[in-house]
A protein has these predicted regions:
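Short catalytic/metal-binding and nucleic-acid-binding patches
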Residues: 1-188
């Protein structure tokens, strides 16, 4: 039985459809990006983030985006967290772990009537609304989030605990402080 999901979603420009390390896309929708390669569909459930790749090519592809890639400031990340609180209150989600990084988010979410992708959509919408309401997002033409999310179902208590540890430690991998969010519920 599914106990929870580990979901990862990126800000606009974080992980492109033709990302050299692979993506979950089957097409490249922007003509200007096609010169950097076709979609790099993978089916792996393991993280590919640390796979060796041509960083210069990846950064050049990001330069071809319609808008600059999004990287949250610390204040913006706090507003994203405030938006998450509103979504959690709206739908009674239980969050076991959260890391809001400059260009992506990791969450461990308890099983819910809504599918993980619907939950992510709700969280993104509330976070975006909070960024705008706080005056922290001025460019209404520039998207905040990438289109997709990645979700891994966790069906054992061991898997849930492992995912929680991974999410809690994730900021440290980027030289950031550990994060403590008021909306996170301890997993028993």
């Amino acid at each position: 039985m599914i106990l929870a999901s580990h979901v990862i979603f990126g800000t606009y420009g974080f992980w492109l459809p033709n990302e050299p390390r692979g993506s979950w896309s089957d097409f490249v929708g922007r003509w200007e990006l096609t010169r950097f390669g076709k979609a790099t569909t993978v089916t792996s459930h393991r993280s590919l983030a640390r796979v060796a790749h041509d960083r210069a090519l990846r950064e050049a592809a990001k330069e071809a985006l319609l808008h600059p890639p999004v990287r949250f400031t610390g204040v913006q990340a706090l507003a994203v967290g405030q938006g998450f609180i509103k979504a959690i209150e709206d739908a009674s989600y239980t969050i076991f772990a959260c890391a809001i990084l400059p260009d992506h988010v990791h969450l461990v979410v308890c099983r819910h009537a809504r599918k993980p992708r619907k939950i992510v959509g709700h969280l993104k919408a509330r976070a975006t609304r909070q960024l705008k309401a706080s005056g922290l997002w001025q460019d209404l033409e520039r998207p905040v989030w990438g289109l997709r999310a990645w979700a891994v179902y966790l069906d054992t208590r061991f898997d849930v605990r492992r995912a929680i540890r991974y999410v809690e430690r994730n900021p440290g991998k980027e030289g950031k402080a550990l994060q403590r969010w008021s909306f996170v519920t301890p997993f028993d």
